[in-house]
Amino acid sequence: MARPTDPIRALLTSPPDLPVVEVLPELRERLSPNPSGSDGVGACLVLTAPPGTGKTTLVPPLLADVLTKRTATGPTTGAPDGKSPGRGPGRVIVTQPRRIAARAAARHLADLLGEEVGGNVGFAVRGERRAGPATRIEIVTAGILLRRLQRDPELAGIDAVILDEVHERSLEGDLLLALLTDARTALREDLTLVAMSATLDADRLCRILGSTSGGASPLVEVPGRLHPLAEVWAPPGRTGRLGPRGVPREFLTHVAATVERALAEHSGDLLAFLPGAREVDDVVARLRGAAREGVDVLPLHGRLPASEQDSALTPSPAGRRRVVVSTNVAESSLTVPGVRVVVDSTLAREPRLDVARFMSGLVTVGVSRAAGVQRAGRAGREGPGVVYRCCSPTDWARSPLAPTPEILSADLTGAALELAVWGVPDGAGLAWLDEPPAAALAAAREALERLGLADTDGVTPLGRVVAGLPAGVREARALLETAPVLGARRAARATALLTADLRAPGGDLTTLARQVRSGGPGSGAWKTEARRLEHACQRAASDRLADPEAMGTAALSDGAGGGDPGTGHSEPARSGDLEMAVALVAGTAQPQWIARRRGPAPQAGKEAHYASVAGTGLRLPAGSALAESEWLAVAGVDLTSGRGDALIRAAAPLDEETALELAGAWLAEEERTVWDGGRLRTERVRRLGAITLSATPGPPPGPQEAADAVVARVRAQGADTGLAVLPWDEEARSLRARLALLHEHLGEPWPDVSDAALADRAEEWLAPAVMSLAGRAGGSGGLAGSISPGSGNRRFSLELLDIAEALRALLPWPQAAHLDELVPERIEVPSGSQVRVHYTAGADAAQIGQTGRPVLAVRVQECFGWATTPRIVQGRVAVQLHLLSPARRPVAVTDDLASFWEQGYPQVRAEMRGRYPKHSWPEDPWNTPATRGTGRRR
């Protein structure tokens, strides 16, 4: 039989030996149209397949072939009139989560077809596209397809979309799935949708895709070829995987040593997983320094030029071994041939959002078990393999089952803008694998409104322009905002330093600017990114000519020193221009991260700490040249689990004037009350968000200000510790204890004086007392007796507050008149003395207000003849008697006097009469007169 002339059909006729081949007939049947070929309804299908089974290699050609036959027997899809000018039939878009995976998949498939990329198979990633009118399979990143979908919700000219590696749960991937299913339901029921996943809950995915056609989508499962995989545990000993500043260098030394060990113990190529590009480059440098004979050590991460990425994916010459040190880009969506050994650091870097501070960044965490299984599986694709895990079995057992989907943990500002452009700002009605968290989405929408990209009516004209630019929301807006000042080219060059995925040495963007401008590492990627952004800026200028409102305050015009952005002509960048420009762009992109150093510059090799406008603490890497700068425009941070501050990864120095201008929305002046050593004073404060710029003494606090401040302090510190700051003297303690006793035994209307109740009712009892104190110096707000000598600012002192008098405001009327009757301050004893009742005996500051036994401490001689124990609170509570020696030391404790005289007193008399012979110790205390003095011995 003659080989088909169509290279795609030829590939399917003689496919490579891959597990997915077993299900190709079933896939063809489920994806083929009805016999009539004109029902106009595309198929929806979910395919699950382990990594390495060939789904990315053979499913797109199969679908392209099926669609070619469908368009040959029925109307051409993707166009309302059945026509699709300028292309061949059967156009398939395949999404990949990463640029490197999209390029690699396109190159591999084109090689199988015997073609160059750009023919039947093409790709499109940020800044690069190789595809033409005849391209039938185009492999793109999710972000590329998302922008196409927003421009054309009908996706005219596209017959099918394959969402690959859905299990990775990227934010753009989840958003794209939701919008595609919405578009298919409303506009393109003929669009074929296929979701391919390795580990995801397939039933849930089937329900979501099936929701576009009223039922669950079919599921096709590809069996994997399982080769034996051995596990070796390689914990780092005393060195932890994570420290307070991220991944310790000692742990990277351990990973490199584990790679050396694995090379010595096993044959074949080795793939090592590290959490990020910094760690990859560190371990690569260590391994290359070891200079093992016949071994090529290659890095693999998204920051590398495409040529270096290709080298890592290309087998080494015969007789040489490869060690590929990679981030998670090689976890599932890339094939690294020849690998028989995997060394897994068991760490991953994931995006996180702190909603309370609206601080987003990357966090290094322990890898999930699902991701760890994916990593290990790379060693068993071609034969028996082994995985070395750099953790203990106990740590592995504690690992989460699956990684957290980005939509549940990342900054949703970009997603919120996409939803606003789509017309559903809250995402309601869309089919989500996981709905966006309400708090994070609300914070994102608030950020969009602050940036002028959205309002209560939805997306603004400026927001629509920003959404169409190939950059993050904040960076795209900064490009448009700074172009009038810098010129389009200079603004694009500065913005490219933030978007080109380059590493700033010591977190210093100005050092990076000098590095790339002089042709150093990263210069090629920077120039490519800058050209791309400049062209985007020019297109935005053209849009402005058609709709000036669309540019808002960012209307592009000739900028100082920047030339005409519309023509792209500008003056060559002068020395220092790029450094100044990147500070302006970074501060415009992230004004809430503008920061001022805390204290003086640190000693050499130490970390410098900064306070940001948003209130989050920031720190520079130790030894960073930026530590001399008081003000910084921060563009990127890493978050460390368990730490409240964030590590600055990209920043540029600012002067104070520019900082105040860029973050002007946070500039405010206020008069506030502050505490100073237990005293209250006022000051006039000028601040930039959470950064205090200046504070000058203000007038004495007025009565209401003082009351509000005291009440706020009590509540802010918690009921127990807050009340402890008040000046509780013995009278106040006693009154509170008396009221607590009444509330416990008689209930309402006697007040609850527990910590929580007093804090809750502070406006009723505490505030009036504070206002009275604050107003006693003549009604001007001055405070008699609370002026510090030599101070120009009179201050309110809590020490002058009469807490007992304040508590009396809680006494109920008319019951207050019976207070001393129910819980008397003093009780008359037989000697005629009025002895104080101790209602707080044994209580410390933390126990004020807790009910306990009232105590009457009195000398034995004053109680002779007293047979009945006194009782209070309408007879409900017996007073506990502490009977004292002449030296006022307790000799007995009782609440039953009759029993004491009969049983306890004889022993006390025997012990005391010799020690205190001048005092009365009668044999018959019942009939002996009580006395305050010594009396006569009997």
Model regions: which residues?
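Acidic, serine/threonine- and proline-rich low-complexity intrinsically disordered segments
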Residues: 454, 489-609, 614-617, 630-826, ...
